[in-house]
UniProtKB/Swiss-Prot annotation:
This is S-adenosylmethionine synthase. The gene is METM. Homotetramer. Keywords: ATP-binding, Cobalt, Cytoplasm, Magnesium, Metal-binding, Nucleotide-binding, One-carbon metabolism, Potassium, Transferase. GO terms for molecular function: ATP binding; metal ion binding; methionine adenosyltransferase activity.
Length: 390
């Protein structure tokens, strides 16, 4: 047997205090508020932020009564932006709101201004979306992405619970894994490099930062079997990261789409998720594609699976559905595609119904806006439910 091919692959993540992620969370908190009161809300909510300012803008048609300013301040405060020193003061920052209603041209074509039956509702726009799954982790997600995401989550956890009180909200992680390729399957061998850059108080030493990150963030997250004496650690390599959040960088909704999905694995059609109601197939199409790909792998039909679906605006049926198992399938991809089409309805109205996507509130969508939309063990993430394909 030929030797297995070895290679390095890298995925990154950012935590909830990153400016772009602030914006994703605000946009999805607005979506939650609209859907909680009016499940038929049509929402396309964008957010941007910079020093001392958060702006919410877009197109929203809803019967809900929404206090946009209160949502902005609440989200920013929960993240930890409670003073200008840390990057933003949630109570004192300027909040700008510029919301218009959805274009009636779009509304009549997509949902007939509310008159179309569920199965007739068309896609809110054209586009192509992807779902991906791999058997290399219990979550059926890429290990590089899982570790980078969990490191970011742990950074926030030890900041909020006081274990590392010197931490501030902004931070980034990156993980490089050495893989071997067996056929089309990816087999993780070891963690090659871990990079963490985290915002911190000005009085903490770099030595203390390094010690705490190793002890309280890396060791609890990364399985010991993947670490060895050759693993490289870059922990706050720039030497100083005091200025962060919107004070350090401008933020915008929808700029972390690879972090939101598969860390560079699989493929991406380019459409962002946050702030969009289920008629926007950028979101709902990607969710159903993930459920389909995950179900293929969980059913033992392949070790890896990529599903693509594409749409036209105002047309209910997808233009195409594609599957690629990278040569790992137990049957031809054409047969797996038949099973996918048998078990999954890709029409936007039915995606919304079958995955219960019109239900907002309880931070249902806000939760998705930090630490990834996929591979999460949470009943609100209905698209992670596996269907047995047979």
């Amino acid at each position: 047997m030929a030797a297995l091919e070895s290679f390095l692959y890298t995925s990154e993540s950012v935590n909830e205090g990153h400016p772009d992620k602030i914006c994703d969370q605000v946009s999805d908190a607005v979506l939650d508020a609209c859907l909680e009161q009016d499940p038929d809300s049509k929402v396309a909510c964008e957010t941007c932020c910079k020093t001392g300012m958060v702006m919410v803008f877009g197109e929203i048609t809803t019967k809900a009564k929404v206090d946009y300013e209160a949502i902005v301040r609440k989200v920013c405060k929960e993240i930890g932006f409670t003073s200008e020193d840390v990057g933003l003061d949630a109570d004192k920052c300027k909040v700008l709101v510029h919301i218009e209603e959805q274009s009636p041209d779009i509304g009549q074509g997509v949902h007939g201004m509310g008159t179309k039956a569920l199965e007739e509702i068309g896609a809110g726009d054209q586009g192509h979306m992807f779902g991906y799954a791999t058997d290399e982790t219990p979550e059926l997600m890429p290990l590089t992405h899982v570790l980078a995401t969990q490191l970011g989550y742990k950074l926030t956890e030890v900041r909020k619970n006081g274990v590392c009180p010197w931490l501030r909200p902004d931070g980034k992680t990156q993980v490089t894994v050495e893989y071997k390729r067996e056929g089309g399957a990816m087999i993780p061998q070891r963690v090659h490099t871990i990079l963490i850059s985290t915002q911190h108080n000005p009085d903490v030493t770099n030595e203390k930062i390094r010690e705490d990150l190793m002890e309280h963030v890396i060791k609890p997250v990364v399985p010991a079997k993947y670490l060895d004496d050759k693993t490289i650690f870059h922990l706050n390599p720039s030497g100083r990261f005091v200025i962060g959040g919107p004070h350090g960088d401008a933020g915008l909704t929808g700029r972390k789409i690879i972090i939101d999905t598969y860390g560079g694995w699989g493929a991406h059609g380019g459409g962002a998720f946050s702030g969009k109601d289920p008629t926007k197939v950028d979101r709902s199409g990607a969710y159903i594609a993930r459920q389909a790909a995950k179900s293929v792998v969980a059913s033992g039909l392949a070790k890896r699976c990529l599903v693509q679906v594409s749409y036209s605006i105002a047309v209910a049926e997808p233009l195409s559905v594609f599957v690629d198992t990278y040569g790992t399938g137990t049957m031809p991809d054409a047969e797996i595609l038949k099973l996918i089409r048998k078990h999954f309805d890709f029409r936007p109205g039915l995606i919304g119904k079958n995955l219960d996507l019109k239900r907002g509130g309880n931070k249902r969508y806000q939760k998705t806006a930090a630490y990834g939309h996929f591979g999460r063990d949470d009943p609100d993430f209905t698209w992670e439910t596996v269907k047995k394909l047979e």
